[in-house]
Amino acid sequence: MDARQMKIKAAQAALGYVESGMRLGIGTGSTAEEFVRLLAEKVASGFQIQGVPTSERTARLCLELGVPLKSLDELPELDLTIDGADEVDGKLRLIKGGGGALLREKIVASASERMIVIADESKVVDVLGAFKLPIEVNQFGLTTTRLAIEKVAARLGLTGDIGLRASGDGPFMTDGGHLILDASFGRIPDAEALAAGLNAIPGVVEHGLFLGMASLAIIAGPEGARTLTAG
């Protein structure tokens, strides 16, 4: 079973948690896109949901495949969000944002009664941090914000490159018009302390640490899909 097949397995398992009539947050990324394709098949057969996308990319795919969408302002409270992750640990702490949609992903997840993460087994880690931590920042005062991030990291014993994400000939721009700094900290033993420190920096719009948000993870491997709960 290759990586895409595992993503499809996880998405299929997640679809079993979606009930007709739900207000559904729909995530961003390659695994979430497999979920959208499967969801579209159910919608075509008469399944009723109202979706709220976490990115313009997801919105385009949903519209292309016929998945009905609303804005979060129209549906400010959601029943369930299904989204992928770049890393997930045994306590269901996540690193997200590899696709650049971390701010909207976190807003949508926080508006949901429940968040289910779908991923293949390569995303499961003992300690977060092998994947670069995305940090969404305001364009104004970029250097000041980067220095502040470095100071927060240093206080926690974290070092590593903090690079500006690029796209083509310029910087990557989020759907909200912000920049992303990707921090290569390596192991992050105290994710809560790092999150608190980043939250206190004025130029940081949001970061990719999703802590205490997921209630279940569906992890697919060669033998099929399994579920993880916070341990």
Curated annotation (Swiss-Prot):
EC numbers, comma separated: 5.3.1.6
Pathway annotation: Carbohydrate degradation; pentose phosphate pathway; D-ribose 5-phosphate from D-ribulose 5-phosphate (non-oxidative stage): step 1/1
Pfam families, per the entry: Rib_5-P_isom_A
Matches recorded under InterPro entries: NagB/RpiA_transferase-like (IPR037171), Ribose-5P_isomerase (IPR050262), Ribose5P_isomerase_typA_subgr (IPR020672), Ribose5P_isomerase_type_A (IPR004788)
Residue numbers annotated as active site: 105
Statement: the UniProt record of this protein carries the keyword Isomerase: yes
BP-aspect Gene Ontology terms: pentose-phosphate shunt, non-oxidative branch
Domain of life of the source: Bacteria
Family per record: Belongs to the ribose 5-phosphate isomerase family.
Function of the molecule: Catalyzes the reversible conversion of ribose-5-phosphate to ribulose 5-phosphate.
NCBIfam families per UniProt: PRK00702.1, rpiA
Quaternary structure and partners: Homodimer.
This protein's name: Ribose-5-phosphate isomerase A
Gene for this chain: rpiA
